[in-house]
Design a protein with these regions (language model features):
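A short acidic, glycine-rich active-site loop
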Residues: 58-72, 129
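Catalytic metal-binding/acid-base residues of hydrolase active sites
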Residues: 12, 45, 90-91
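Active-site catalytic loop in hydrolytic enzyme cores
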Residues: 63, 76, 92-138
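Active-site-proximal beta-strand elements of phosphoester/diester hydrolases
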Residues: 3-15, 100, 113-116
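A structural motif corresponding to the C-terminal end of an alpha-helix
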Residues: 70-88
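Active-site beta-strand/loop signature of hydrolases that rely on acidic residues for catalysis
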Residues: 6, 20, 28-57, 78, ...
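Beta-strand-turn-beta hairpins that frame and shape the catalytic cleft
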Residues: 1-6, 135-138
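N-terminal phosphate-binding loop and adjacent alpha-helix
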Residues: 10-27
Length: 138
């Protein structure tokens, strides 16, 4: 049986998408240089966690799979480093919003997506305000 090394990355996110992508890029490269072949980044790492309050302006953060900055950036990185990168992003599909993960293969192609099914709803987690339960199964 072949062994596969993976890495889980934790990072503090800022309000700047560009800063967060740059920080994540640096950490992905470090993990890959240490032999990781599957590298997991934090959920919705493109910006600070915004789901703690209800704010209609935050709907503007959502992007399609094809237009998301992190997905497009890390497709190139995955191909360059030959690693698999599950990338979490705030997806807008027509007029429906999802908490989605795109799984990017080691050649830079998107293997598929998973839309989060179980959306928490609590005083500090207003995710049901932002996300529709996913339709991609388990």
């Amino acid at each position: 049986m072949r062994k596969v090394k993976y890495a889980g990355i934790q990072m503090q996110c800022t309000k700047s998408v560009e800063e967060n992508i740059a920080k994540a890029d640096k950490m992905v490269r470090k993990a890959a240089s240490e032999g990781a072949k599957i590298i997991l980044l934090p959920e919705l790492f493109e910006r600070q966690y915004f789901c703690q309050e209800r704010n209609y302006d935050y709907y503007l953060y959502a992007r399609s799979l094809e237009d998301d900055e992190a997905v497009n950036h890390f497709k190139k990185v995955a191909a360059e480093l030959e690693v698999v990168l599950p990338i979490s992003f705030y997806e807008k599909d027509v007029n429906v919003f999802y908490n989605t993960t795109a799984v990017i293969d080691a050649d830079g192609s998107v293997l598929g997506i998973y839309r989060k099914t179980h959306i928490p709803d609590d005083h500090y987690y207003q995710e049901k305000f932002y996300f529709t339960p996913g339709d991609t199964g388990f």
